[in-house]
Amino acid sequence: MSKPITFVTGNAKKLEELVAILGPSFPRTIVSKKIDLPELQGDIDEIAIKKCKEAARQVNGPVLVEDTSLCFNALEGLPGPYIKWFLEKLQPEGLHRLLHGWENKSAQAICTFGYCDGVDAEPLIFKGITEGVIVEPRGPRDFGWDPVFQPSGYDKTYAELPKSEKNTISHRYRALALLRQHFEKQDKLIN
């Protein structure tokens, strides 16, 4: 039997979405643990790999880490992986105002999961991207920048969409679909 995978997060909403998206049929047991990992700088993949290695070292077993980016095309990818700090200082209204002088309001929501089987294993990266636009904040404000991100093809922001619908189109869903495929493929090789 496989060891449980420790999802390293202190964000209850991320854990809630992960559990809802993976569902009961996911072939591994997921437990969560809050660990203070260093806040890293770099590109999206570098950050996920470094976080994953440090988490595996601290947990001494299989870990899953997640890093989310919101990349404004007019700002050449900013705030990107630094969205947490931009949101903390600017709130959703400020994120929207960042693009005030730009015609291009397009953005990418990017979720990067890093999985590491243990201390000596190399991390695997699973990345999901959802295209959209930045709009004036709409909807509940209970999950980060969801009120300002409107996915392409929708007239509602992430915050306005029912969770069940958001969880079938989001950047997190897309990354977790790749993670699920990895473990299902691995299980077929074992069985």
UniProtKB/Swiss-Prot annotation:
Keyword Transmembrane: no
Tagged with keyword Cytoplasm: yes
Keywords in alphabetical order: Cytoplasm, Hydrolase, Magnesium, Manganese, Metal-binding, Nucleotide metabolism, Nucleotide-binding
InterPro entries named among the record's database cross-references: ITPase, ITPase-like_fam, RdgB/HAM1
Transmembrane segments: none
Localization annotation: Cytoplasm
The protein's name in its UniProt record: Inosine triphosphate pyrophosphatase
Lineage: Eukaryota, Metazoa, Ecdysozoa, Arthropoda, Hexapoda
